[in-house]
């Protein structure tokens, strides 16, 4: 039966990349435009621009020097973006078009650490690691001011919101805030009240008050008339950013009066709202479950009423400013992707485990992201139940969790369990129905966890919290770490793969040992049951994949081809093929019957830890240490259909070409023969044209009416013809037409013309020398002919007398 099913299925021949989820933010500054439609963030050498509504990457801006971006800022009118690189160059961008309008040297002696525009969008201030502050007029294109006096890195600069006051504020590593007068070109005041680095400066709407925050766990309110402190508010956390809120009531945030209120973000990982007058905290954001994530950045887009925060693991969160309701989540950088799975009954989502305690769920169509909190240490593995609504995760925190996605795509934790004494490195769900799951740990044990009926009927919106799971069976299975588990399609068998170089087969639910698979030279990374045959596949660090018979535990086949460890293996094409991923970043497609590698796919740059195939077997998803998540599509049928269409088109064109040659319509025949890539037919057409008494004129007219790509192909054909003395005359005739009628600049613009000319020269010289010798010989024969004279016949002797 399995053989019949495998015979009816079509073998896959190729996969193509359909979509990539790549890092777009690796730390540093992130900024919203005033409308809240676009998000700007730094990623290495680029500034990426995202559409906030869809999450799509619209454009990447990269300077010509291809050095890391150290700072950037968007003007208040949203028209100009300026970036600074490690090469000490400033670039002014028309960011909507993606073009650089001006590039100039920063004049700083060290990289630019901070920059800010004034309210008029005409002045730009840059703070350097050399302790200097410079001001630039980006309209007139010149430097206006150069302020010195700050010790060390100037990591913070800000203009006063009132452009008529011409004041610039800066802060360096000495924890003080300097006030610079652009009018007097001097330092007006040095504000010293912080005892650690100042992290942010924000101004009231009238510009009479400034709020500063620091890592000394205080926020200070300053009077900008007297440059004195009016209030020092202890906030009991290291503050990375603070924002002055609009002076209007916001009941959802505990703001009941129109006095001065501000919001802080820091190492506690939550947003808090403070009343400046009393120094009291009036609102505290609810703490997310799981490990606390430090907030590293916070900024307010007043016109859009949006608040942007950034977490330490590079997640960007957008809130509604007046209520702090979460609107959008973006995963800027997933670091090392450890596992990835399709999610949902129609595989509409994927769930990703990266080098983080948080899980990320992406909707594939829109790439909308949902970040799941719960684990307190790095999540190591995932698995999904058959229907696609429930999935399980395990982590280094020695716990497991079960998550449920509702029909709206929202995911919540519905169950959790603990009992292992070391990190839980692998997890596997039951296959027939949602009845149990199995976990394997570094404590060398396997646990079987039955799912209670209450869990399956439980709504994710319930307030009673996650159901607690209890292990039914615990068994010590190996002597070293258990790296992989697999449950058979009938839920009766369990396979385990370990670092001890063996795989074992167990009977469920009591975990009774049935047999051991031995033969690999190094540890096993993955085990998988065939969906149709009684076969087990194992992937090992020795670079091989082995197929084993479940009846007698013998090795049936060994697949060799990976140059490094094989990390994952999956059955595709109804069990007739294998798809594997390795630590060299390669994916390989194998046909089991022939034992051959059909295709090698190269799109990752590092280890591919995650590999999962969709329920319809037409897509695959991979995730690797390069932080890339790639969606692959089976393009076998599409390529075969395309190849069939090409063959049919070739037959039609060939018939048309034969008809044209029969009718002696050489111009169309020449163009068609070139498009069919038939050098011999093209040669035949040119020979037929040259047999005509008016060959030169007809050949010129025919060649000159060809398209440029056809002329390029004809020139390549000439290179081949020119190597043969029998066909060199046609090649030279075509070359002569091109040289006489095409300008040198046009010829040099041809694709591959330099290589063609280099190949033509030696044979052309050889043909020229041969013809010269022939001409010389012919001339010599002619000379001999004209100089040959016959001796006169002797006269008859007179008769004798």
UniProtKB/Swiss-Prot annotation:
The keyword Phosphoprotein belongs to this UniProt entry's keyword annotation: yes
Coiled coil start-end: none
Residues joined by cross-link Glycyl lysine isopeptide (Lys-Gly) (interchain with G-Cter in SUMO2): 407
SUPFAM superfamilies tied to this protein: WD40 repeat-like
Keyword terms of this UniProt record: Acetylation, Isopeptide bond, Nucleus, Phosphoprotein, Repeat, Ubl conjugation, WD repeat
Cellular localization per UniProt: Nucleus, Nucleolus
Task performed by this protein: Part of the small subunit (SSU) processome, first precursor of the small eukaryotic ribosomal subunit. During the assembly of the SSU processome in the nucleolus, many ribosome biogenesis factors, an RNA chaperone and ribosomal proteins associate with the nascent pre-rRNA and work in concert to generate RNA folding, modifications, rearrangements and cleavage as well as targeted degradation of pre-ribosomal RNA by the RNA exosome.
Oligomer status and interactors: Part of the small subunit (SSU) processome, composed of more than 70 proteins and the RNA chaperone small nucleolar RNA (snoRNA) U3.
UniProt xrefs under PANTHER family: TRANSDUCIN BETA-LIKE 3 (PTHR19854), TRANSDUCIN BETA-LIKE PROTEIN 3 (PTHR19854:SF15)
Name the UniProt record assigns to this protein: Transducin beta-like protein 3
Species, as recorded: Mus musculus (Mouse)
């Amino acid at each position: 039966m399995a053989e019949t099913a495998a015979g009816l299925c079509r073998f896959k021949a190729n996969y193509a990349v359909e979509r990539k989820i790549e890092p777009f933010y690796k730390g540093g500054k992130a900024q919203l435009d005033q409308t809240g439609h676009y998000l700007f963030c730094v990623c290495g050498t680029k500034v990426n621009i995202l559409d906030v509504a869809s999450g799509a990457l619209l454009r990447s801006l990269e300077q010509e020097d291809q050095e890391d971006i150290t700072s950037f800022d968007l003007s208040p009118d949203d028209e100009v973006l300026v970036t600074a690189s490690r090469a000490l160059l400033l670039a002014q961008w028309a960011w909507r078009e993606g073009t650089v309008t001006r590039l100039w040297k920063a004049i700083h002696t060290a990289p630019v650490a901070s920059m800010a525009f004034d309210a008029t969008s005409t002045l730009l201030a840059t703070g350097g690691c050399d302790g200097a502050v410079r001001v630039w007029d980006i309209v007139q294109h010149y430097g206006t001011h150069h302020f010195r006096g700050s010790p060390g890195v100037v990591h913070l600069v800000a203009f006063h919101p009132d452009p008529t006051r011409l004041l610039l504020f800066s802060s360096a590593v000495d924890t003080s805030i300097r006030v610079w007068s652009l009018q007097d070109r001097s330092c007006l005041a040095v504000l010293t009240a912080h005892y650690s680095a100042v992290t942010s400066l924000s101004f009231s709407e009238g510009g009479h008050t400034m709020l500063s925050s620091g890592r000394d766990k205080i926020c200070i309110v300053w009077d900008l008339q007297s440059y004195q402190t009016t209030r020092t508010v202890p906030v009991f956390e290291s503050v990375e950013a603070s924002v002055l809120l609009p002076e209007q009531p916001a009941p959802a945030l505990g703001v009941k009066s129109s006095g001065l209120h501000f919001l802080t973000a820091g190492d506690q990982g939550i947003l808090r709202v403070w009343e400046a007058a009393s120094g009291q905290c009036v609102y505290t954001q609810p703490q997310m479950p799981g490990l606390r994530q430090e907030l590293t950045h916070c900024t307010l887009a007043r016109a859009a009423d949006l608040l942007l925060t950034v977490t330490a693991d590079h997640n960007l969160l957008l809130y509604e400013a007046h209520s702090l309701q979460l609107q959008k989540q973006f995963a800027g950088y997933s670091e090392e992707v450890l596992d990835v799975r399709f999610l949902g009954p129609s595989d509409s989502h994927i769930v990703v485990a990266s080098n983080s305690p948080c899980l990320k769920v992406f909707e594939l169509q829109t790439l909308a992201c949902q970040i799941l909190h719960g684990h307190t240490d790095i999540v190591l593995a995932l698995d999904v139940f058959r229907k696609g609504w429930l999935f399980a995760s395990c982590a280094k925190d020695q716990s497991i969790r079960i998550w449920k996605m509702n029909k709206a795509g929202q995911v919540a934790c519905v169950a959790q369990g603990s009992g292992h004494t070391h990190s839980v490195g692998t997890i596997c769900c039951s296959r027939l129905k949602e009845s149990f799951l199995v976990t394997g740990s570094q404590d060398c044990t396997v646990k079987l966890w039955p799912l209670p009926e209450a869990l399956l009927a439980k709504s994710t919106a319930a307030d009673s919290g996650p159901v607690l799971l209890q292990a039914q069976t615990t068994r010590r299975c190996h002597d070293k770490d258990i790296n992989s588990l697999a449950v058979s399609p009938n839920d009766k068998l369990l396979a385990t793969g370990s670092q001890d170089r063996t795989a074992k087969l167990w009977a469920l639910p009591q975990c009774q040992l049935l047999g051991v698979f031995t033969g690999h030279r190094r540890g096993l990374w993955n085990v998988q049951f065939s969906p149709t045959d009684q076969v087990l596949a194992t992937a090992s660090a020795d670079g091989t994949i082995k197929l084993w018979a479940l009846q007698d535990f013998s090795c049936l086949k060994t697949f060799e081809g990976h140059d490094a460890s094989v990390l994952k293996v999956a059955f595709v094409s109804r069990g007739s093929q294998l798809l594997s991923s390795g630590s060299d970043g390669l994916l390989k497609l194998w046909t089991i019957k022939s034992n051959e590698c059909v295709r090698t796919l190269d799109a990752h740059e590092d280890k591919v830890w995650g590999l999962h195939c969709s329920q319809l077997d037409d897509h695959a998803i991979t995730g690797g240490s390069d932080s890339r998540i790639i969606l692959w599509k089976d393009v076998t049928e599409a390529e075969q259909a395309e190849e069939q269409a090409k063959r049919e088109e070739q037959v039609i064109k060939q018939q048309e070409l034969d008809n044209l040659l029969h009718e002696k319509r050489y111009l169309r025949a020449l163009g068609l023969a070139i498009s069919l890539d038939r050098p011999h037919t093209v040669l035949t057409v040119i020979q037929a044209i040259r047999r005509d008494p008016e060959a030169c004129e007809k050949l010129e007219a025919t060649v000159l009416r060809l398209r440029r790509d056809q002329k390029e192909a004809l020139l390549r054909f000439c290179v081949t013809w020119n190597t043969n003395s029998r066909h060199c005359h046609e090649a030279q005739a075509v070359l002569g037409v091109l040289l006489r009628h095409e300008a040198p600049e046009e010829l040099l613009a041809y694709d591959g013309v330099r290589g063609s000319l280099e190949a033509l020269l030696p044979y052309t010289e050889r043909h020229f020398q041969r013809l010269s010798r022939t001409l010389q010989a012919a001339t010599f024969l002619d000379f001999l002919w004209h100089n040959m004279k016959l001796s006169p016949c002797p006269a008859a002797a007179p008769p004798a007398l």
